[in-house]
Amino acid sequence: MITVKAKKEKVDDVKAFLSNAVNLAREEKETITWYSFQIDESTFGIFDTFEDESGREAHLNGKIAKALMENAPELLAEEPSIKKIDVMSSK
């Protein structure tokens, strides 16, 4: 899971980035689910799931992560918070 804090003047750009990133996620065969969400006015997140650790690592080294890190200085007020989580149960 990742959370990002957009610069106040870049909120719309971060929304657009995340909305468009789903197309890159669809290309990742090992990414099972991918969601972007908004927490408050300028805080956003991505929640995604993978079949196994190799899928997670492929994603973390993939196009979305690369684009986010390249654009982070321009778009984000602080470094992204990336946490590896394991789903314990689901419905």
State where each predicted segment sits.
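An amphipathic, aromatic/His-enriched active-site/gating alpha helix that lines ligand/cofactor pockets
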Residues: 20, 24-33, 49-83
